Amino acid sequence: VLAAENQMPSWHVEPAQSMPDFTTLVLKKRMEELLEEPCRTSLEHTSLPAWLPKRRWFAGKDTAIDTVRIAYGVRFGDPQHPVLLSEIEVTSAGHTSRYQLPFGFIAEDQVGPALPQQLALARVRRVRQVGLITDAFSLEAFIRAVLQGMQNNTVLESSEGEIRFAPTAQLEKLGLGAESEVRYLSAEQSNSSVVVGNSLVLKLIRKVASGVHPELEMSAYLTEAGFANISPLLGSVIRRDAQGEDNLLMIAQGYLSNQGDAWEWTQNNLERALRDELADAMSEQEQHYNALGDHQQ
C-alpha cells in the first residue's frame, strides 16, 4: 500500500530528482585540503551559499547570505572514512551566526542509503577516485566514530580550541559497539538526531553558541541526581574556545521508545477532538430532525 504525500512518516525524505551540477574540487590526498586554496574559496563563495538555504536547520533562509567562512576544520575518524569536524560562520544583514557542519566523503558510485547523496554539496576528485563532499552526519561511519570518541575520552586540538568527547558512567553500561544499529530519526530538524543500538540518541547541535547549554546542564543534573523519569545523559562533545567558554557540539542521551513524536501526538489529539465535535453536532442535528418529525405527527 502506497502512502499519500500527507501521510508520509516524519523521517521520510523526498528523493532527489537529479544530481545538481556540482562544482568539482580536486584533492591530492587529505581532507584538510578543503581548507586550503582553491577549495576553500570554492566552498565559501559557491557551494555553501547555494546549499545552506535548502537545509531545514539553517535559520537564515529568508535573508540573503553575505558571506560564509569556514571557521576551522579538524581531522576525525579513520582513514577509510575521512571526516572534518567543522563549524562555519554565516553573515546575513550584518548578523553573524555559527553552524556546525562536519564534512564527509563518499564515492560517487557508492551503494548504500540515499541520504548522503541527497545532502552532498560538492563533487571531488581525489587521485583516481571521484566522489562527493557531504554532510558527515548522514554517514553511519561518522556516528560510530563519535560514539567511539566518547567511549575513549578523545581530545582533538583545533585552531579554535580543544574538542573533548566525554562519556558519563551510564554509557559503558549499554555495551554499544561497531555492530550496533544506526537509525536516523529524521533527515533534518533544527538539530540532527540518530538512534544507536535502540538505546542511545545522538544529537548534533547545528546552531552553535558559547556558554552553558540548558539541555546539557539540566540533563547532567537530573542524571547525577538519579532522577528516573528522564532520558539519562550518556555523553557529550564540547569545544572550549580561547575565552574558556564551552560550546556544545553534540549530546548523547538515553533513547525512550514511544509511539511517535510530539507533532504526531498533537495531530492525533486534534483529529480525535474534531471527530468528537462532529459526532456531537451530528447527534444534535438528528435529535432536531426527530423532534420536528414528532411535532408534525
Named regions from a protein language model:
Residues 19-67:
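Short Lys/Arg-enriched alpha/beta "domain-start" segment
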Residues 1, 5-14, 71-297:
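Conserved ATP-binding subdomain of kinase catalytic cores across diverse folds
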